[in-house]
Amino acid sequence: MSQDVLTLAQDLIARASVTPLDEGCQPLMAKRLAAKGFNIEPMVFEDTTNMWARRGDQGPLFCFAGHTDVVPVGDLNRWHTPPFEPVVIDGYLHGRGAADMKGSLAAMVVATERFVDKHPDHKGSIAFLITSDEEGPFINGTTRVIDTLEARNEKITWSLVGEPSSTHKLGDIVKNGRRGSLTGNLTVKGVQGHVAYPHLADNPIHKAAPALDELARMKWDNGNEFFPPTSFQIANINGGTGASNVIPGSLEVMFNFRYSTEVTAEILIQRVLNILDAHGLDYDISWIFNGLPFLTDAGPLLDATREAIYEITGTETDPQTSGGTSDGRFIAPTGAQVIELGPVNATIHKVNECVKVEDIEQLAKVYERILEKLLC
């Protein structure tokens, strides 16, 4: 078995790129891509390092997308091995970012090297959109690169995001879409006072409770064949001074929608406002638009991905839209077809994160086969 993917994955993991740091990961990738004819364009926005690398100037444009940043390691005492000293144990590569997503990055680079060596005159173009701001606030990462590309009319046809999509074995699941995400920050106003004199106060918790109950019980839509019904979840509630004898003067509630293509953010916002107003609440509310829902249905990218997975691994893949958000949400609105395909996600963001070495080698072969199907 070739050790190319393993070696590069280890080199990437050894760089402690806790978000928003890159710690030299992108230059490492860039050096190898430049040797294969890629034009390397670093894009640094404030604290975030991004890279746009492209080989070719014609369409269609296939883009590998991913991130070099990783989440913090947590309690070091719970790690069996140092998180930034990658080691292989019983066939698994251990280290922070092994599964999310430095194993995928290594597979992308090696797959591209192999493809270009075999098909130097391939049709279209290949690109890499890499950021160090996926695990963080996602302000200066992929979204800023996409803005730059849009401004110069550089259009991505197909994008493969290397997020760890697999559940039990490599390729059993690919993400061909994601739900939208909308966060609300609600402040319900009241009048602070002594609990013994409620007539002199106005308890915002009591006032808000019926409205919150209605929001929690509301059926927002029925979903569809690609998306489950929209979900409303209260994430945080804060009210009171900590004392048992004080009626609070305000209540703060943070909630989130994960919504399907059956509704829009604007529809959800209006329905929330209607409920709050119907309960006569005095409130302030602000909204954070985390991402629109997107879906890549049957077409060249999804078809090539399903075929490649089966041909390399023998697995019949299941396209799904479940899970959290990814940077695919910033790429899809440009009109690109977007799918996510990466290794098993069982240990992502956990202590002792690891990935099966055989899986990232197989992943490189799948990525290469996808390139062959689309650009040969």
Curated annotation (Swiss-Prot):
Pathway assignment: Amino-acid biosynthesis; L-lysine biosynthesis via DAP pathway; LL-2,6-diaminopimelate from (S)-tetrahydrodipicolinate (succinylase route): step 3/3
A Pfam family reported for this protein in Swiss-Prot or TrEMBL: Peptidase_M20
GO BP: diaminopimelate biosynthetic process; L-arginine biosynthetic process; lysine biosynthetic process via diaminopimelate
Entry EC no(s): 3.5.1.18
EC top class, as a word: hydrolase
Keywords: Amino-acid biosynthesis, Cobalt, Diaminopimelate biosynthesis, Hydrolase, Lysine biosynthesis, Metal-binding, Zinc
Catalytic activity as recorded in UniProt: N-succinyl-(2S,6S)-2,6-diaminopimelate + H2O = (2S,6S)-2,6-diaminopimelate + succinate
Needed co-factor(s): Zn(2+); Co(2+)
GO molecular function term, any single one: zinc ion binding
Binding site for Zn(2+) 1: H67, D100, E163
Catalytic residues (UniProt): D69, E134 (proton acceptor)
Keyword Metal-binding included in the entry's annotation: yes
Keyword Metal-binding among UniProt keywords: yes
Cofactor binding description: Binds 2 Zn(2+) or Co(2+) ions per subunit.
Gene3D superfamilies according to UniProt: Zn peptidases (3.40.630.10)
Binding-site list for Zn(2+) 2: D100, E135, H349
Function: Catalyzes the hydrolysis of N-succinyl-L,L-diaminopimelic acid (SDAP), forming succinate and LL-2,6-diaminopimelate (DAP), an intermediate involved in the bacterial biosynthesis of lysine and meso-diaminopimelic acid, an essential component of bacterial cell walls.
Family stated for the protein in its record: Belongs to the peptidase M20A family. DapE subfamily.
Subunit structure: Homodimer.
Protein name, UniProt field: Succinyl-diaminopimelate desuccinylase 1
Gene expressing this chain: dapE1
